[in-house]
Amino acid sequence: VDALAAARAIAELKVQPRPVSLAYEASPVMDIILGAAKEGASLYAVTDPAGITHRVWEVKREDAVGAIRAMLDQAPEPVLADDPAYAGALVGASQLLADEARSAGTYTGKEPFNFTVAVLFPAAQVSGGAPQVPTGLLTHQVARF
């Protein structure tokens, strides 16, 4: 797939089809924090065609969000665990949409296309390939609003 064509297709959607997968170096403290976040009911539980169930939890408590941020600040930078072409297409789509907004005189820098939704996985979970949230789940949820 041509990189520019992929970027144009995403820009036309005006929504990110799926999160970018990133891998981080796990730590026992992070495992405890995330384990506590997963004690409640998940927001989504989607089973893909391969029979794998993907669950998504929302972390709302300010102290938990702060603890996760603090742990990520101390850890090495997450690395891309996704298809580099997909990540590049997202960057390209963002640039196309930014250029369009600048031409229209409406660019503020706070548009949704300036941000990317990412999913963090412990590096040990991605050694055989990055797990991915099913394509379309994010698009569907954004389209609801």
Positions of PLM-derived features:
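Surface-exposed, charge/polar-rich loops and edge strands
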Residues: V1-F145
